[in-house]
Structures are given as structure tokens and as C-alpha cells.
Swiss-Prot record:
Residues 152-195 are annotated as: Domain III. It comes from Carboxydothermus hydrogenoformans (strain ATCC BAA-161 / DSM 6008 / Z-2901). This is Holliday junction branch migration complex subunit RuvA. Residues 143-152 are annotated as: Flexible linker. Disulfide bonds: none annotated. The RuvA-RuvB-RuvC complex processes Holliday junction (HJ) DNA during genetic recombination and DNA repair, while the RuvA-RuvB complex plays an important role in the rescue of blocked DNA replication forks via replication fork reversal (RFR). RuvA specifically binds to HJ cruciform DNA, conferring on it an open structure. The RuvB hexamer acts as an ATP-dependent pump, pulling dsDNA into and through the RuvAB complex. HJ branch migration allows RuvC to scan DNA until it finds its consensus sequence, where it cleaves and resolves the cruciform DNA. Keywords: Cytoplasm, DNA damage, DNA recombination, DNA repair, DNA-binding. Residues 1-63 are annotated as: Domain I. HAMAP family: DNA_HJ_migration_RuvA. The gene is ruvA. Residues 64-142 are annotated as: Domain II. Has three domains with a flexible linker between the domains II and III and assumes an 'L' shape. Domain III is highly mobile and contacts RuvB.
Length: 195
């Protein structure tokens, strides 16, 4: 499998680039939001997913490993193909998509072209146990505000040496409504850790 490409951008289209790696040109489909940063003759490192189908072999490239992992994860959901997976990842960063899935934000997910209500429900069902975050809220808070605050708290706990599972467990116990800043959230989480 081709996992990483490091080379020079030779050509660019509306949805792909050709990357020259030691004289071999690889055509790689990329996210539209990442296409603008890929300039001709620039050196790139792309984390890739090779998809083999009846009609050919296709490479999908991403600027980071986390996005590539999410692409493969989305493809594991029945009814989600590469086109829909790219559309979802073009709309959401992996971190934001974690929150959308954990909080079952159907409204946000169905705004993505090609993702209807059934696909959104299937994503929630099939990925709920595979994503990195746990749902920290049950109310209608916006994903952006909630993610910013609690994403920072989560990252802060990880940087303090907690495992992802420990951080999720502690965050699941915290009363979210009383916390206004990441610092308050981390302090409260550390109190739970010491109990």
C-alpha cells in the first residue's frame, strides 16, 4: 500500500494533483480546501489512502495523518464512498467531525453535499464507538463553541500526561454549564482526577 508520498507538485486540476516522486508521477485526489496550498513545483508530503475498485486504483492524499485516518474510517461506513468522505472532510476537520458524530449533530452533517439523513444516522451508529471523543453535552450548544472550549480542555489534559481514555472519562463527569474557560475546565478536571 502507498501510505505517504514525498515529492514535487507537477500538475494541478480542480480536484487532484500530480506528485513527482523520483521520476514517477502519482495522481492524487485531494480535498478542495487543501488544493489552494499546493503550488506547482512545491515540495509536498501527502498521507495517502489507496482505494482499489473494479474500475481502477485511486489515491487520495491529505496534508496530515489524522485526516487520512478519518477518510479511511468514513469509508468503513456502508453507503459512504470516497466522494462523500471527501465532501465530509472538506467541510469538517477531524476534530470537529469527532464532535459532530459524538453529539449526533444531524443538522451539521446533512449540510454536506451528498450526505442525507439516512447516511448521517448510519455514520452516528457505525462510528460512535470508533471516534476519539465522547459526547460531552446533550443540549443544543453550537458545535463550534462547544468544541473550542472542551477541545482545548481535552488537549490540555492530554498534554498533562493523561491518556485519551482517562481524559474522556473525567470530562464525562464534569458539569459543563459552570465552566467558561479552558483553564476552569482543566482545573475542574484535575480535581476529579485527584478524587
Amino acid at each position: 500500500m502507498i501510505a505517504v508520498l514525498k515529492g514535487k507538485v507537477l500538475d494541478k486540476t480542480l480536484d487532484s494533483v500530480v506528485v513527482d516522486v523520483n521520476g514517477i508521477g502519482f495522481k492524487v485526489a485531494v480535498l478542495p480546501r487543501e488544493l489552494g496550498s499546493l503550488n506547482l513545483n512545491s515540495e509536498v508530503v501527502m498521507y495517502t489512502s489507496l482505494q482499489v475498485r473494479e474500475d481502477g486504483w485511486f489515491l487520495y492524499g491529505f496534508s496530515d495523518e489524522e485526516t487520512r485516518k478519518f477518510f479511511d474510517l468514513l469509508l468503513s461506513v456502508s453507503g459512504i464512498g470516497p466522494k462523500a468522505a471527501l465532501a465530509i472532510l472538506n467541510e469538517f476537520t477531524p476534530e470537529k467531525l469527532n464532535w459532530v458524530i459524538a453529539n449526533k449533530d444531524e443538522k451539521a452533517l446533512t449540510k454536506v453535499p451528498g450526505v442525507g439523513k439516512k447516511n448521517a444516522q448510519r455514520l452516528f451508529l457505525e462510528l460512535k464507538d470508533k471516534i476519539g471523543y465522547t459526547s460531552f453535552t446533550s443540549n443544543e450548544e453550537s458545535v463550534e463553541n462547544f468544541q473550542d472550549l472542551w477541545g482545548d480542555v481535552y488537549k490540555g489534559l492530554l498534554s498533562l500526561g493523561l491518556s485519551a481514555a482517562e481524559a474522556r472519562e473525567i470530562l464525562g463527569k464534569i458539569d459543563k454549564k459552570s465552566v467558561k474557560t479552558p483553564e476552569e475546565g482543566i482545573a475542574l478536571a484535575l480535581r476529579f482526577l485527584n478524587k
